């Protein structure tokens, strides 16, 4: 049970770091290849 509490207390921090890294990768990708993220249907 102690491990579950530790996981639940660290999950928001890990999610914030993960989303920040993902957003940074998408922003840099969009800076170098601005037309590849939005495909016309």
Curated annotation (Swiss-Prot):
* Keywords attached to this entry: Membrane, Photosynthesis, Photosystem I, Thylakoid, Transmembrane, Transmembrane helix
How does this protein sit in the membrane? Single-pass membrane protein
Q: Which GO terms describe its cellular component?
A: photosystem I; plasma membrane-derived thylakoid membrane
Superkingdom of origin organism: Bacteria
NAD among keywords: no
Ranges annotated as spanning the membrane = 7-27
**Coiled-coil segments:** none
**A biological-process GO annotation:** photosynthesis
**Gene3D superfamilies associated with the record:** Single helix bin (1.20.5.510)
Return the InterPro entries for the record: PSI_PsaJ (IPR002615), PSI_PsaJ_sf (IPR036062)
Q: Which cysteines are joined by disulfide bonds?
A: none
Q: Which Pfam family, any one, appears in the UniProt record?
A: PSI_PsaJ
For the keyword Thylakoid, the answer is yes
The compartments listed are:
Cellular thylakoid membrane
What does this gene product do?
A: May help in the organization of the PsaE and PsaF subunits.
Give the family, as the similarity comment puts it. Belongs to the PsaJ family.
Its name, as the record gives it, is: Photosystem I reaction center subunit IX
Source organism per UniProt? Synechococcus elongatus (strain ATCC 33912 / PCC 7942 / FACHB-805)
């Amino acid at each position: 049970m102690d491990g579950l509490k530790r996981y639940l207390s660290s999950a928001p921090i890990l999610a914030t770091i993960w989303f920040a890294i993902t957003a940074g990768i998408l922003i840099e990708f969009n800076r170098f290849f601005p037309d590849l993220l939005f495909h016309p249907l």
